[in-house]
């Protein structure tokens, strides 16, 4: 389950438009497409935030925000070239993590359809890079730059207000088999910004280690964040786990269910997630 929700991907955001090479994409990836298909929930949110919403003709089956986006049954995970081509787009935003993404990209290029290949960012700077690249690719560079500037200021204000004076141990739960996200990941960086001490950092797992119940109990986190709340996990289910009642976060009811989807996307609502984390942990020392 968690694999469809977690932040994952190579260390560098690489944006490719049409046949442009990675070395020159930043300079050449510009244009003013009028028929955009977004096969990425994060990209969909970014497009609307930078003023490109009117150019979007279709979005994938997971792009549920904003509600005004033209929702379809196009799959972001298993894209179908024929289904995409039927919309006659002039730009398709494709996730590099999609099944057979490289082949899909080449097949679309053969049909003279430009492709923006999106690689999941590992930190907020890489997310901002996607904002700017999408702005350039869609003809809205100024709006994208302004949005990034505003977001940076808002996040800085939130972190300044809520950052912990002393490191506070936390556990981010991706699913009930105890996969987590360490500080090398996108969401892990957000926790680091608040001076949280991520207990997953002690494990090995390429950014997303699987912890044992014993290691979580021993680490005794003061806060537990549940990314699997929509899948049935709650304060009650966590408290019912053998031995977990001894954990500080459980004893003090500092188990926080994260909002659906926002933690797993790197669009403009990143600011909302920072604010949520700051406000819900403000009184926890």
Task: Go through each PLM region and give its residues.
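Proline-aspartate-enriched helix->loop->beta-strand connector
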Residues: 80-97, 113, 212-226
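Structured C-terminal subdomain patch of bacterial secreted/periplasmic proteins
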Residues: 34-35, 122, 126-136, 145, ...
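Extracytoplasmic ligand-binding site segments that recognize negatively charged/polar headgroups
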Residues: 103, 119-134, 169-188, 232-234
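Basic- and aromatic-lined ligand-binding clefts that recognize polyanionic substrates
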Residues: 29, 34-50, 142-194
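C-terminal segment of classical bacterial N-terminal signal peptides
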Residues: 17-25
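His/Asp/Glu-enriched short active-site or ligand-binding loop at hydrolase and phosphoryl-transfer sites
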Residues: 60, 184-208, 257
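Bacterial N-terminal signal peptides that target proteins for export
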Residues: 2-11
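A short, structured surface patch at a secondary-structure boundary
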Residues: 35-87, 91-97, 102, 196-199
């Amino acid at each position: 389950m968690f694999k469809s929700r977690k932040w994952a991907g190579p260390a560098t955001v690489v944006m490719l438009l049409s046949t442009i090479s990675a070395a020159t994409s930043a300079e050449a990836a510009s244009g003013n497409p009028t028929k955009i298909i977004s096969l990425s929930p994060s990209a969909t949110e970014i497009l609307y935030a930078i003023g490109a919403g009117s150019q979007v003709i279709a979005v994938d089956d997971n792009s549920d925000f904003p509600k005004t986006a033209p929702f379809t049954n196009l799959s972001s995970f298993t894209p179908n070239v024929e289904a995409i081509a039927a919309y006659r787009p002039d730009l398709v935003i494709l996730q590099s993590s999609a099944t057979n993404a490289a082949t899909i990209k080449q097949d679309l290029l053969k049909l003279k359809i430009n492709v923006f290949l999106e690689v999941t960012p590992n930190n907020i700077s890489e997310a901002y890079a996607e904002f700017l690249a999408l702005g350039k690719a869609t003809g809205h560079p100024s709006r994208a730059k302004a949005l990034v500037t505003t977001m940076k200021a808002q996040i800085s204000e939130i972190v300044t207000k809520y950052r912990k004076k002393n490191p506070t141990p936390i556990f981010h739960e991706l699913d009930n088999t105890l996969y987590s996200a360490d500080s090398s990941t996108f969401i892990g960086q957000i926790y680091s910004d608040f001076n949280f001490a991520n207990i997953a950092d002690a494990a090995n797992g390429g950014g997303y280690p699987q912890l044992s119940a014993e290691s979580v109990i021993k680490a005794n986190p003061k806060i537990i964040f549940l990314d699997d709340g929509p899948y049935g996990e709650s304060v009650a289910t966590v408290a019912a786990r053998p031995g977990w009642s001894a954990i500080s976060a459980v004893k003090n009811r500092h188990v926080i269910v994260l909002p659906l989807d926002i933690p797993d996307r790197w669009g403009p609502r990143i600011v909302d997630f920072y604010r949520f984390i700051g406000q819900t942990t403000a009184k926890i020392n």
